[in-house]
């Protein structure tokens, strides 16, 4: 048989040329032990911290503990179907989520998968969940107002775009209600405001009941606010890693708007539950516990998350991400570990009290303990003009009210101060789902600090406010427009507003 070398080499070359590239090299390891949502894996020598790994059946996990002989992996899902000896595959990707405007109006889990039954999300961009916060140079100091629509907050504890303002209080004091009202208040700007002022909303529900999240979504949908909102839900029945990851996923989605010259508002509801799930993961991974059994890096967990809320400078597109983290206290104890941590990280706190809530002062904001470290730079001039005096008067009222309980014979000046304070406190009450535009708040507070309420019985203040708003919307719309466009109360506007108030006060019975 005649073998020709040239023919053989031609055949071999042909075979090599058409050789399929189906062979795929992937680094695999084996499960040594699994339980409580944690798997110990042997053999993933080159895995990165925070990398996604894949178990049989498509279940995903994240490598957190990189030890000399094994890797501690937290599992995003049920660990029931994973058993000892299973192969674990590296994906080569750090945990990321879809981002972009395609997510608006949707409810997703902590990995960005839709859970609202409205079909897939066709997002083209993805972003890592845990990225470094912007440095000092790309930032700009907070100077634009982020209006919540609540008089007590916008006048006394103003929040600016790019600020982190903590909402803290016991259970059932209206913390989520403040977030919800802030979201609903953005509707007017979205419907007919300039593109550059629109504020996109992101709500992260951590460890909440599903019914609570469903109710939140329902209210947003009914009031037309879901179209500019993204909901990330890691409910109480979800595994701890999902609850730990959800705030970071939500932050990545909010950062898309910040980095593209837009504005976003994110509410984390709440970070106490995220800390608890992180503690659970850390203890199961055998990391050493610290105070209240939390791991040593629980401060870093929250600081690296909240530092990502920022106001960018003009070179970076002037976008912003405003954060409203929520912390639940036990018995008004703000000196516990997690509350003190988050208070020290944020730029101020809105402190809600059970006693005020049951007295009917809602939103139940304790104005004495609440503070905004950005202050009046996050207010328009018109609001500064009226809110400056209300702060002082309420502070004096709180001081006097404590002493007034003991003595009955009060001089006229003290009596006047107490009367004014009681009426201003009444004026700051506001029913849920009824946020006010800034110009309407300015007009109402102007009436309060200029003595228009002093002659009224306290019980009539709410009725007077409703009547005044209706009157201004119909008869005095030019005054409201002037306050909105000029962003200040000029002498001319002040004269017109005073005349309108005089006219309304005469007719009010």
Swiss-Prot record:
Any one Pfam family match given in the protein's UniProt record, by short name: ATP-synt_ab
Its membrane topology: Peripheral membrane protein
Keywords, sorted A to Z: ATP synthesis, ATP-binding, Cell inner membrane, Cell membrane, CF(1), Hydrogen ion transport, Ion transport, Membrane, Nucleotide-binding, Translocase, Transport
UniProt-annotated binding residues for ATP: 169-176
Catalytic EC class: translocase
GO cellular component, one term: plasma membrane
Intracellular or extracellular location(s): Cell inner membrane
Signal as UniProt keyword: no
Site (Required for activity): residue numbering on this chain: 370
InterPro entries: ATP_synth_asu-like_sf, ATP_synth_asu_C, ATP_synth_asu_C_sf, ATP_synth_F1_a_nt-bd_dom, ATP_synth_F1_asu, ATPase_a/bsu_AS, ATPase_F1/V1/A1_a/bsu_N, ATPase_F1/V1/A1_a/bsu_N_sf
Catalysed reactions listed for this entry: ATP + H2O + 4 H(+)(in) = ADP + phosphate + 5 H(+)(out)
Record-listed E.C. numbers: 7.1.2.2
GO molecular function: ADP binding; ATP binding; proton-transporting ATP synthase activity, rotational mechanism
NCBIfam families: atpA, PRK13343.1
Function description: Produces ATP from ADP in the presence of a proton gradient across the membrane. The alpha chain is a regulatory subunit.
Subunit structure: F-type ATPases have 2 components, CF(1) - the catalytic core - and CF(0) - the membrane proton channel. CF(1) has five subunits: alpha(3), beta(3), gamma(1), delta(1), epsilon(1). CF(0) has three main subunits: a(1), b(2) and c(9-12). The alpha and beta chains form an alternating ring which encloses part of the gamma chain. CF(1) is attached to CF(0) by a central stalk formed by the gamma and epsilon chains, while a peripheral stalk is formed by the delta and b chains.
Family listed: Belongs to the ATPase alpha/beta chains family.
Protein name: ATP synthase subunit alpha
Organism this protein belongs to: Rhizobium etli (strain ATCC 51251 / DSM 11541 / JCM 21823 / NBRC 15573 / CFN 42)
Name of the coding gene: atpA
């Amino acid at each position: 048989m005649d073998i020709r070398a040239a023919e053989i080499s031609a055949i071999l070359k042909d075979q090599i040329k058409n050789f399929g590239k189906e062979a795929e090299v992937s680094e695999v390891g084996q499960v040594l032990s699994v339980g409580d949502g944690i798997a110990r894996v042997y053999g993933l020598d080159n895995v990165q911290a925070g990398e996604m790994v894949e178990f049989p059946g498509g279940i995903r996990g994240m490598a957190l503990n990189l030890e000399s002989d094994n890797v501690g992996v937290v599992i995003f899902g049920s660990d029931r179907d994973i058993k000892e000896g299973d192969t674990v595959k590296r994906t080569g990707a750090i945990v990321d989520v879809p981002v972009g405007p395609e997510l608006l109006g949707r409810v997703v889990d902590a990995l960005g998968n839709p859970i609202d039954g409205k079909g897939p999300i066709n997002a083209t961009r993805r972003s890592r969940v845990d990225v470094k916060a912007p440095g000092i140079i790309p930032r700009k100091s907070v100077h634009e107002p982020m209006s919540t629509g609540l008089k007590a907050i916008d006048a006394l504890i103003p929040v600016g775009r790019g600020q982190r303002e903590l909402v803290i209080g016991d259970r059932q004091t209206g913390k989520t209600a403040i977030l919800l009202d802030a979201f609903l208040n953005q509707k007017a700007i979205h419907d007919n405001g300039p593109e550059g002022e629109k504020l996109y909303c992101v709500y992260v529900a951590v460890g909440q009941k599903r019914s609570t999240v469903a109710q939140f979504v329902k209210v947003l949908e009914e009031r037309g606010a879901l179209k500019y909102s993204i909901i990330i839900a890691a409910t109480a029945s979800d595994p701890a890693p999902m609850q730990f990851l959800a705030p970071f996923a939500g932050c990545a989605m909010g950062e898309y708007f910040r980095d593209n010259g837009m504005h976003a508002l994110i509410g984390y509801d709440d970070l106490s539950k995220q800390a608890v799930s992180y503690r659970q993961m850390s203890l199961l991974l055998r990391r050493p516990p610290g105070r209240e059994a939390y791991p040593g890096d629980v401060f870093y967990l929250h600081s690296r998350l909240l530092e990502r809320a920022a106001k960018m400078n003009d070179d970076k597109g002037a976008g912003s991400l405003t954060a409203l983290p929520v912390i639940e206290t036990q018995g008004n104890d703000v000196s516990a570990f997690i509350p003190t941590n988050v208070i020290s990280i944020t730029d101020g706190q809105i402190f809600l009290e059970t006693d005020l809530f049951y007295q009917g002062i809602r939103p139940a904001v304790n104005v004495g303990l609440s503070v905004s470290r950005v202050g009046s730079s996050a207010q328009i001039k018109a609001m500064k003009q009226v809110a400056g005096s209300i702060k002082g008067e309420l502070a004096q009222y709180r001081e006097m009210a404590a002493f007034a309980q003991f003595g009955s014979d009060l001089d006229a000046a003290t009596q006047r101060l107490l009367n004014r304070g009681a009426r201003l406190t009444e004026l700051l009450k506001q029913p849920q789902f009824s946020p006010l535009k800034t110009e309407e708040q300015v007009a109402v507070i102007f009436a309060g600090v200029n003595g228009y309420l002093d002659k009224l019985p306290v019980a009539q203040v709410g009725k007077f406010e409703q009547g005044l708003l209706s009157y201004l919307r119909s008869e005095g719309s030019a005054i409201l427009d002037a306050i909105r466009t000029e962003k200040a109360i000029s002498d001319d506007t002040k004269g017109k507003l005073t005349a309108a108030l005089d006219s309304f006060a005469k007719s009010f019975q």
